[in-house]
Each structure stands twice: as structure tokens, then as C-alpha cells.
Amino acid sequence: MNKVKCYVLFTALLSSLCAYGAPQSITELCSEYRNTQIYTINDKILSYTESMAGKREMVIITFKSGATFQVEVPGSQHIDSQKKAIERMKDTLRITYLTETKIDKLCVWNNKTPNSIAAISMEN
């Protein structure tokens, strides 16, 4: 009888976790963070600048519209789990720029200047 109760409890807990699930779009993902907003870009990156100069280590991208965004290069202010993700975002933006892939939407933290990219959605 105790095994049945444990099984039912485990099943209920597991299904509640599965119901939450992963975000299905950049909009859902962005809504999980504070101080963020979605920018609809639908354009290629016009310029890509990478700086490794001291305290200004970052990647800056600009679009035809003049919109400018950044990705910080991982530093001492980031925990180890953030560093790989930031490096991947930087690499993704470099490849996106070089292949002239269109960026559909960006989720950005709007409490930094320029706005710092949290997530990216691309299209072919």
C-alpha cells in the first residue's frame, strides 16, 4: 500500500514538472526574466564590433535601423555556468554576421546600455 502512495505522489510531482516545460518561443523565454523586452529586428547585422580592451570587453552589433545591442565577454563578474553561454552567444552573433543570416527577434535586458542580449531568434 505504501508503494502505491509513493508511486502516486511521485507521478503527481513528475507530471507537474513536465507540465511547466521549456519555453516554446523567444517571447515565452523572455517573459521568464525581469528587466527584459523583445525587439523585432527582421534584418541582418550591419556591423559587428568585438572589444577585448580591459573593462570594456564586449561584442557590439548594430542594425540598419540604428539599433545597437551588446553581449558582454565573460569576466570575473560572471559565474562559471554563465561564461560558456555568453561565449556561445558571442560566437553565434559572429557567425550570424558573417553568413548574413537575418535575426528575427532579440530578447534584451533593458537596464544596461547598450541593451544586453539575453536570447536570440533567427530565420533563414
Curated annotation (Swiss-Prot):
Keyword terms: Disulfide bond, Enterotoxin, Plasmid, Signal, Toxin, Virulence
Function, as annotated: The biological activity of the toxin is produced by the A chain, which activates intracellular adenyl cyclase.
Organism: Escherichia coli O78:H11 (strain H10407 / ETEC)
Pfam families reported for this sequence: Enterotoxin_b
Entry annotated with the keyword Disulfide bond: yes
Disulfide bond sites: 30-107
Gene3D superfamilies cross-referenced by the UniProt entry: 2.40.50.110
Listed name of the protein: Heat-labile enterotoxin B chain
Complexes and interactors: Heterohexamer of one A chain and of five B chains.
Any one Gene Ontology molecular-function term assigned to this protein's record: toxin activity
CC terms in the record's Gene Ontology section: extracellular region
Range of residues in the leader sequence: 1-21
Organism lineage string: Bacteria, Pseudomonadati, Pseudomonadota, Gammaproteobacteria, Enterobacterales
